[in-house]
């Protein structure tokens, strides 16, 4: 005799007869409702782009953070529940520091992503907890640029270019047509911004976009100010206008 669906909903540790964990699926829905975040690799490094439009004129825009420094050579973008994201970002920073103290060397991007996925997976198999309603894009440079996505289930995937959040489908479709392995840094930046514009179906405003990157030559995370972003946004908006007319 099978439990009604409500029974499987309440029990995170119980599979439904067709092999589903409903709470994990609901956590993925929380990510789909989140703001879009994009990651893209290029020859010179890896770039993260996040939508940080505010929903109220009373909100201090400077307090909204969507891209985080994890270590000198690693950054992360989030989409989903903000409080859950903060917990995972803190966890990632701690793991990076533990590795430095233990081995006297920086953690690799893949190892950090695996540790975060292991942590997330634990919250899918124990009673009294729920899955994290957030996905992370973890980006950085070891010997070469790396870009990983962590799923609420704890799954880990590596990408050349991808997105999380409500604009994922539009961005993925665009990247599948336009992405190339030999992109320069500037071209990758513009391509990522065009994808963001298509995801929100609007031209971009530099103040509403957060951008961070790590380059191969110095392996150091850097943020892009709205002033520095303007020439890239102007180039992207020309293409966005063309594509939105079609």
Swiss-Prot record:
Q: Which residues form a coiled coil?
A: none
Q: Which molecular-function annotations from GO does this UniProt entry contain?
A: threonine-type endopeptidase activity
Gene3D superfamilies cross-referenced by the UniProt entry: Glutamine Phosphoribosylpyrophosphate, subunit 1, domain 1
What's known about how it's activated or inhibited? The formation of the proteasomal ATPase PAN-20S proteasome complex, via the docking of the C-termini of PAN into the intersubunit pockets in the alpha-rings, triggers opening of the gate for substrate entry. Interconversion between the open-gate and close-gate conformations leads to a dynamic regulation of the 20S proteasome proteolysis activity.
PROSITE patterns from the xrefs? PROTEASOME_ALPHA_1, PROTEASOME_ALPHA_2
Q: What GO biological process terms are annotated to this protein in UniProt?
A: proteasomal protein catabolic process; ubiquitin-dependent protein catabolic process
Q: How does it assemble?
A: The 20S proteasome core is composed of 14 alpha and 14 beta subunits that assemble into four stacked heptameric rings, resulting in a barrel-shaped structure. The two inner rings, each composed of seven catalytic beta subunits, are sandwiched by two outer rings, each composed of seven alpha subunits. The catalytic chamber with the active sites is on the inside of the barrel. Has probably a gated structure, the ends of the cylinder being occluded by the N-termini of the alpha-subunits. Is likely capped at one or both ends by the proteasome regulatory ATPase, PAN.
- What is this protein's function? Component of the proteasome core, a large protease complex with broad specificity involved in protein degradation.
Q: What is this protein called?
A: Proteasome subunit alpha
Organism, by scientific name, is Archaeoglobus fulgidus (strain ATCC 49558 / DSM 4304 / JCM 9628 / NBRC 100126 / VC-16)
Gene name per UniProt:
psmA
């Amino acid at each position: 005799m099978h439990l009604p669906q409500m029974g499987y909903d309440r029990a995170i540790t119980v599979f439904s007869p067709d092999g589903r964990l409903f709470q994990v699926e609901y956590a993925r829905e929380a990510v789909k409702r989140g703001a879009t975040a994009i990651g893209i690799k290029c020859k010179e490094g890896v770039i993260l782009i996040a939508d940080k439009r505010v929903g109220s004129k009373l909100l201090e825009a400077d307090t909204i953070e969507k891209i985080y420094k994890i270590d000198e050579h690693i950054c992360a973008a989030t989409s989903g529940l903000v409080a859950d994201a903060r917990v995972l970002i803190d966890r990632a920073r701690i793991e990076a520091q533990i590795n430095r103290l233990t081995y006297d060397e920086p953690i690799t991007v893949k190892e950090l992503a695996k540790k975060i996925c292991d942590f997330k997976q634990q919250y899918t198999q124990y009673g009294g907890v729920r899955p994290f309603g957030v996905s992370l894009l973890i980006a950085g440079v070891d010997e070469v640029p790396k870009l990983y996505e962590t799923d609420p289930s704890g799954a880990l995937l590596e990408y050349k270019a991808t997105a999380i959040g409500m604009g994922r489908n539009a961005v993925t479709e665009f990247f599948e047509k336009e992405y190339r392995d030999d992109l320069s840094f500037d071209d990758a930046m513009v391509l990522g911004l065009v994808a963001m514009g298509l995801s929100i179906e609007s031209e971009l405003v530099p103040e509403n976009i957060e951008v961070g990157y790590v380059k191969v030559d110095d392996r150091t995370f850097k943020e892009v100010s709205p002033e520095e972003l303007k020439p890239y946004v102007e180039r992207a908006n020309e293409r966005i206008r063309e594509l939105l007319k079609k």
